[in-house]
Every structure is written in structure tokens, then in C-alpha cells.
């Protein structure tokens, strides 16, 4: 995998979520990007059932990514995180006396993958309880694993179809003690999705937000 940036794109004025997604699709296709199937990323929230200390318990987020169908990522609120195989979901069921699934808190992003030269772009509709809450854009530069070596190129590419909505360098990279010149890993991508999902959970349901 390469360096990845995940961001939320606002719904265009006077447009629905789906209309804005379609607009982004057209912009990518005008650049010459080619569709390469679909993708999905989801996140389920768990909270500890027993806490003898009286302190608020940290939440546990269990995430899946269609790019890694045999893996499961788990991130504690504020860190740390781990990557395991799909049997981790079975383990969480067996640990239900310790971790309770927060019903109604599942968030997912589903959409279309595009390939443009060395870039992989994923435009997704972020949904919660079958209601669209926003739009996610993931851009991966597959030819590099060092953020500091390719960010300017990635930003220039994103400006070509996101315009003023082009994001700044993700904090998951700037917060690393080693700086921008350490190889990325899958947890960097999932941490960005988790940050985005946490934001959309707090948003109001958008008009015309039924997921098709």
C-alpha cells in the first residue's frame, strides 16, 4: 500500500449526497480516471461493561476494509491499535461479557474505486442506520510509502477534482514522533477513517439521505 489521505467532502449547495457523489465521479472521469470496482470500510463501536476504577472506560473500535478482506483492525480510543485476522470478530462475540456492542453506532462508507496512473481514488457515501451522513474521499498514491516524499504531488492531484475542499496533510502523519519520513502502514488509513466516522456520528441527518 502507498501513502493515503482520507477526508470528508461537504455536500454541494443545492445538491443531495448522491448528486454530489455523481459530480465527483464525473470530475474524475474527465481527468481520465477509470472505474475499478467498489469498496467499503466499516466501524463498530464497543464499550467495556465493567469498570472498577470509576473512570470513564475507553471505547474500542473494530474496523474492516475491503482492501484487506481477511483482516480486522481494532483501535482503542486514543490508541493503541492492532491488526488481526477475521477471527477477531468471533473473539469479540466471546468477550461480550467484557465488551458490549454499541447498537446503532455502526458507521460505514461504500462507493466506487477509481484508478488514475499511480493514484487509487475511492469516493464513498458515509452512512449510519441506513441514513447518509456525508461523503468520504480516499486518495492513495501507490508509488510511495513516505508521506514527506509525495505529499505535494498528492495535494496537487486532489486539487484537480476537489478544488477548495482539498485537505491539509493528515494529522496521523504530522503527529508521529519520527516525522514525515517513516513508512506508512494500514493503521494510518484506518485512523483517518475513524476520525472521519467520529465526526459524522455527531452530524444531523442530511436531507434526502436515504442510502440506495
UniProtKB/Swiss-Prot annotation:
GO CC aspect terms: mediator complex
Keyword Transcription regulation: yes
Organism domain of life: Eukaryota
Annotated GO MF terms: transcription coactivator activity
Principal cellular location given in the protein's record: nucleus
GO biological process: regulation of transcription by RNA polymerase II
Location in or out of the cell: Nucleus
Keyword set, alphabetical order: Activator, Nucleus, Transcription, Transcription regulation
Function description: Component of the Mediator complex, a coactivator involved in the regulated transcription of nearly all RNA polymerase II-dependent genes. Mediator functions as a bridge to convey information from gene-specific regulatory proteins to the basal RNA polymerase II transcription machinery. Mediator is recruited to promoters by direct interactions with regulatory proteins and serves as a scaffold for the assembly of a functional preinitiation complex with RNA polymerase II and the general transcription factors.
Similarity annotation: Belongs to the Mediator complex subunit 20 family.
Entry protein name: Mediator of RNA polymerase II transcription subunit 20
Amino acid at each position: 500500500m502507498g501513502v493515503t489521505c482520507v477526508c470528508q467532502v461537504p455536500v454541494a449547495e443545492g445538491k443531495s449526497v448522491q448528486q454530489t457523489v455523481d459530480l465527483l465521479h464525473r470530475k474524475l472521469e474527465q481527468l481520465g480516471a477509470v472505474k475499478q470496482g467498489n469498496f467499503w470500510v466499516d466501524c463498530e463501536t464497543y464499550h467495556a461493561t465493567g469498570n472498577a476504577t470509576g473512570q470513564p472506560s475507553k471505547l474500542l473500535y473494530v474496523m474492516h476494509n475491503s482492501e484487506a478482506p481477511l483482516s480486522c483492525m481494532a483501535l482503542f480510543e486514543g490508541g493503541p491499535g492492532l491488526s488481526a485476522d477475521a477471527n477477531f470478530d468471533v473473539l469479540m462475540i466471546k468477550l461480550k461479557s467484557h465488551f458490549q456492542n454499541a447498537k446503532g453506532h455502526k458507521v460505514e462508507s461504500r462507493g466506487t474505486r477509481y484508478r488514475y496512473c499511480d493514484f487509487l481514488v475511492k469516493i464513498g457515501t458515509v452512512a449510519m442506520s441506513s441514513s447518509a451522513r456525508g461523503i468520504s474521499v480516499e486518495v492513495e498514491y501507490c508509488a510511495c510509502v513516505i508521506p514527506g516524499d509525495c505529499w505535494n504531488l498528492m495535494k496537487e492531484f486532489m486539487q484537480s477534482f476537489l478544488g477548495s475542499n482539498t485537505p491539509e496533510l493528515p494529522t496521523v502523519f504530522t503527529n508521529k514522533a519520527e516525522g514525515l519520513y517513516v513508512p506508512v502502514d494500514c493503521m494510518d488509513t484506518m485512523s483517518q477513517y475513524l476520525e472521519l466516522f467520529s465526526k459524522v456520528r455527531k452530524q444531523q441527518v442530511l436531507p434526502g439521505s436515504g442510502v440506495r
